[in-house]
Amino acid sequence: MHILHIASSPRGERSVSLKLASRYLETLTSLHPESTVDVLDVWTIDLLPFDGPALEAKYADLQGVQMSDEQQAVWKQIHALGERFHRADVILFSVPMWNFGVPYRLKHLIDSVSQRGVLFEFDAQGMRGLLKGKNVVVFASRGVALGEDFPTEAYDHQVAYLKTWARMVGIPTIDAVLSEATLADPATAEANFTAALAEASKLAAAVQP
């Protein structure tokens, strides 16, 4: 089993979402020691600006126009990034909530790699995702708890966004574990985190290779 872990918090070992993902991976690899993990840290990877040559390459591809050498080089890098998704059996996101959404570097990664011929295609029925048969697991942290003041259906642009992306690339359902109210009083934050850790272990134990 091969896991692609997309780490999107810049806080390192202090990150709640990363701690949850680490618990999941520790449990999973202890049960399936043959598993391999590819860590894609959005804060350390060299993401190309998606403008200029990258944008022109995108439209050249869509329109069937010959790319320049510069555009071909950029497009080759995007395909290489996409291969990391294709090689994975499990795509794992550890993601904090920033302003009700995801960190901008994660959005940059997704915008770069989600291209025709990389993660999806068009056919007679419309868009067809190319990552069918894979699992997506999201470990999400939130400083506040969504609820009465901030209804989930209106304010969740974190897990809901990743669900939408997963459907676009051919993965109809995802598993998500939340640790909310990380900025609340210590007792509340710790209780939520402890429950989320247990859920992460349980989710990993249920994985079938």
UniProtKB/Swiss-Prot annotation:
What is this organism's lineage? Bacteria, Pseudomonadati, Pseudomonadota, Gammaproteobacteria, Pseudomonadales
Q: Which Enzyme Commission numbers does its entry carry?
A: 1.6.5.-, 1.7.1.17
Cofactor field = FMN
Its UniProt entry gives the catalysed reaction(s) as: 2 a quinone + NADH + H(+) = 2 a 1,4-benzosemiquinone + NAD(+); N,N-dimethyl-1,4-phenylenediamine + anthranilate + 2 NAD(+) = 2-(4-dimethylaminophenyl)diazenylbenzoate + 2 NADH + 2 H(+)
Q: Which residues form the signal peptide?
A: none
Keywords of this entry:
Flavoprotein, FMN, NAD, Oxidoreductase
Give the co-factor note: Binds 1 FMN per subunit.
Q: Name one GO molecular function term.
A: FMN binding
Q: What is this protein called?
A: FMN-dependent NADH:quinone oxidoreductase 2
Q: What does this protein do?
A: Quinone reductase that provides resistance to thiol-specific stress caused by electrophilic quinones.
Q: How does it assemble?
A: Homodimer.
Task: Name the residues that bind FMN.
Answer: S9, S15, V16, S17, M97, W98, N99, F100
Q: Has keyword Oxidoreductase?
A: yes
Member of which family?
Answer: Belongs to the azoreductase type 1 family.
The answer to whether keyword Flavoprotein applies is: yes
Gene coding for it: azoR2
